[in-house]
């Protein structure tokens, strides 16, 4: 943001971080992709930000970066063990910017395993 974040920006980041955690936790074999999206979307709805989340939660990753299954509010597929998917909730304010937190996961019986992680917490860097 080019300066210290405002309280609104910090709240927006915290909401997206919580939505990300909910989406990751929901990534279990046999789970409907729409249910995974709904877990993250519920967090944003409770924070009054659902209308600012304008895309699906994620997608499969394989030979191409964007593959099936879609993980969205319109998804029809089911997540299976050993699938590689992204979880990437975001909230955007027109003319101001937004926050997106994205990780790539392998779906496993014991729970999702992160292949990437941006870490947690808001990091403010100087310009």
Question: Each PLM stretch: what is its role?
Answer:
Residues 1-127:
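Active-site neighborhoods and metal-handling regions in enzymes and metal-associated proteins
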């Amino acid at each position: 943001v080019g300066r210290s974040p405002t309280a609104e920006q910090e709240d927006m980041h915290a909401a997206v971080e919580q939505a990300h955690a909910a989406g990751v936790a929901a990534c279990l074999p046999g789970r409907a992709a729409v249910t995974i999206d709904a877990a993250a979307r519920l967090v944003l709805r409770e924070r009054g930000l659902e209308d600012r989340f304008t895309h699906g939660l994620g997608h499969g990753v394989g030979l191409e970066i964007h593959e099936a299954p879609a993980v969205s509010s319109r998804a029809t597929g089911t997540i299976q063990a050993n699938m590689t998917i992204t979880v990437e909730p975001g909230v955007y304010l027109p003319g101001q910017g937004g926050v997106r937190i994205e990780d790539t996961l392998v779906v496993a019986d014991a729970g999702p395993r992160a292949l990437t992680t941006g870490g947690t917490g808001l990091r403010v860097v100087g310009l």
